[in-house]
Regions:
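Structural microenvironment flanking redox-active thiols in thiol-disulfide oxidoreductases
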Residues: 276-315, 325-332, 363
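A non-transmembrane, solvent-exposed segment enriched in polar/low-complexity residues
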Residues: 9-166
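N-terminal "domain-start" segment that seeds a small globular fold
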Residues: 222-256, 363-366
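Sec-dependent bacterial lipoprotein signal peptides
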Residues: 1-7
Length: 370
């Protein structure tokens, strides 16, 4: 409640003042965080050094959220903006990042505490030490030592994942009224989930709308609302978006060309190990439904045709295939976060099932194919 009251008044223009003595630059960038995990940021404003400081005058539409401030969109540090005037002072700078001391924003204190808790409680120091040993062994090409370190590391990573989720959940509950809670939910929970049915989409929408008013003013909330609309378009029961590409002979092939059949649509590429591990199960499915209106369509995001064709021949995956054109947004339209991603489309072109793997590639179509 105290934090909520501190962030309640955000409709005015706010100011970021930065003193970066020791940083060799005459310009700083304010960036929207596209992905903290991948380090992807998009510049939305810049400030020039004047009288020993940089000043950002934020517009009212700048939503409360985590931002990135640095001498480039890829070299800087994270700062929470919450509508308050804040002052940044250079704390430390390395080749990888910039550390800012932040004054005027209570959320930054909470965010810094979260980062420290996350590092400490998920064995950060131990994992860093093991990683250093692993890279040294790799430089020596000592495969035996690399394997030993990898085996020693796995329990820390496995337990670390569990501890991270518990810590994230606790911070979300404590900060549901402010942008930090909803940012943590978006970046560390929502982006790792899938919503294959309209019921799950509705439940998710109700949950994110249970966050406080300040949280719902953040860009994280807006991104989730937008994503849920996209999920509705590719939910089970909806018509599968069209897929267009070139087959192995260079001819155009469309998903709609297979209308009238039950189609397992397999999104994959040649360098995806887990994708190619599904090939035996796909072969079994093709054999199981032989003579029936059943097809498999491989949809590849490969960029090199030879690698794609070689993988098809090496694996013996002799069914319909197409390779997407560069820049095709079909993965986005199907709400795919990772591959392999296999769905079942009915004869009428509607999605019947999603996220199929292994034995499900036979068991699920078996419920429909007659």
């Amino acid at each position: 409640m105290i934090l909520f009251m501190m962030f309640a008044c955000t409709s005015r223009q706010s100011v970021i003042t930065v003193k970066a003595k020791g940083l060799n630059t005459g310009k700083l960038y304010l960036c929207e965080v596209i992905s903290e995990y991948r380090g992807i940021h998009q510049a939305i404003d810049s400030a020039i050094l004047k009288n020993g400081k940089f000043v950002f005058n934020l517009q009212e539409e700048t939503s409360p959220d985590l931002y990135f401030i640095g001498d480039s969109p890829w070299h800087g540090g994270y700062v929470f903006l919450d509508g308050n005037d804040i002052k940044l002072t250079l704390e430390n700078v390395t080749e990888e990042q910039i550390f800012w001391e932040v004054k005027g924003s209570p959320l930054n204190k909470v965010y810094r505490k979260f980062e420290k808790d996350l590092y400490d409680k998920t064995f950060g120091q131990i994992k860093d030490s093991l990683s250093t040993l692993f890279y040294k062994a790799r430089e020596r090409q000592d495969r035996e030592e690399m394997a030993r370190i990898k085996n020693e590391s796995m329990p820390y990573y496995d337990e670390g994942v569990k501890r991270e989720r518990m810590l994230v959940d606790s911070y979300i509950q404590e900060n549901k009224a402010n942008p930090l809670g909803i940012y943590l939910y978006y970046s560390r929970v929502f982006q790792r989930k899938d919503f294959p049915t309209e019921e799950e989409i509705t439940m998710e929408r109700e949950y994110i709308r249970s966050f406080g008013e300040m949280a719902q003013a953040s860009s994280s909330f807006m991104k989730m609302e937008k994503d849920l609309l996209r999920y509705e378009d590719c939910a089970i029961g909806h018509e599968a978006p069209e897929i267009i590409g070139k087959d192995t002979l260079g001819n155009e092939l469309r998903l709609s060309d297979l209308r009238g059949n039950y189609v397992l649509v397999d999104f994959w590429n040649s360098y995806c190990h887990w994708c190619r591990e599904e090939t035996p199960a796909l072969k079994q499915a093709l054999e199981h439904f032989a003579g029936k209106n059943f097809k498999i369509l491989g949809v590849s995001s490969d960029r090199v045709k030879k690698l794609w064709l070689d993988a098809i021949h090496e694996d013996g995956s002799y069914w319909d295939h197409l390779m997407l054109e560069k820049g095709d947004d079909v993965m986005d339209r199907y709400c795919i976060k990772g591959i392999p991603h296999i769905i079942l489309v009915g004869p009428d072109g509607k999605i019947l099932a999603k996220e199929l793997r292994g034995q499900d590639l036979i068991d699920v179509p078996d419920k429909f194919v007659k």
